[in-house]
Amino acid sequence: MKIKTVVSIVIISIILLCALFILFREHESLENNVIDNPVIDETSNQKPPEIVEQTIEEKVDKIINEMTIEEKIGQMLIIYDTHETVDEELKQFIKDIKPSGFIINQNNITTFDKTKKYIEDLKQNSEIPLIISIDQEGGKVQRLQNLEDEKATYIPSMLDLGKTNDIELAYEVGRVLAEDMRTLGINVVYAPVCDVFSNPYNEVIGNRSFGSNPNLVANMCVSLGKGLEDNGIIATYKHFPGHGDTTTDSHTSLPIINKSYEELLNNELIPFKKAIENDAKIIMVGHIAFPDLTNDNIPASLSKKIITNLLKNDLGYDGLVITDALNMGALINNYSDEDIYVKAVEAGVDILLMPSDAKKAIEVIKDNISVERIDESVKKILIFKYTYLKDNILDESYLNNKEHQEIISKIPIE
């Protein structure tokens, strides 16, 4: 009996020891699992760590910190190119200069497919998004009428559109322009014209203006600009501070407008003020002298008093400032290339349009302008690009389609 009792005790002890061993191993496994795969109590106040996304400004700051001074200045240049295709020479130019963008012109515009391919190839050869811009106002300035096979929608003059005083129609015309341009990959247009047609003998502006009433011009400009931008093309409001009251063509010589600050506020500046109030992103400064503002005959495009003091400080504009084309007679007949480049940047310009020599522009700006001033413009340019330049090309069927023609037919042509 005693032997049986002892045996029973031993067996029970062994069973208990085995059970304890199994429990110990399970507990150890559970602890290891907790360490490797923590379980978050959904009822607690603890939140999982958030993934912090890089802001556009942070991205731009990083890019600028990694750029050479030459690359920074390249971002301040928009190039006039004469190629029909992006050949090895042009690829090397883009690699060397790293320009901010190109202005599409009659030299680049051939067939629809070739022009589209040219623009695609420009973009593919640039690490930073390119501004692909064009003069496509309507009336006598619409470069896409040079397409050899499929014409863009023909837009009547802005003076004809202005006579309707129909801001909704102006918006729709902006949409038509935008959709045509997006079929090719264009993203910026040098329109609308904000000049008030106050001099009936002004042939250089003439019917490019919406009219002689500054408030009508303001309303039509802003509405057309909104039609452009709501449909993927960034508008450029031009030619600050106003090219409407002169008979001189700045393509050949320097216009001089003798108007006081008060006179400009009550006329020429009204459309630009309204554009600024409605978030204008680019304003083009014209090659026009206003001696009552500057006490000399310096063109507005080279004047700190007009660009920094008037446009930025007085009117509160903080968007991009671009020059009119730098190969125009108003400048090149009065200044050297070196003076043009340096004076424009000193005045407050961010982007130089069509410098005649990009390498020279980079050299003289590097030698005469502080890094801080260059960085100021480059940061604005890059923030603009990464915010607004979207690769949203439309199908070719949008070009000059039936709906576009129906909209344009509402503009009475005189």
Where are these regions (language model features)?
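Active-site mouth loops of central-metabolism enzymes
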Residues: G74-V86, M158-Y171, S253-N267, N327-Y335
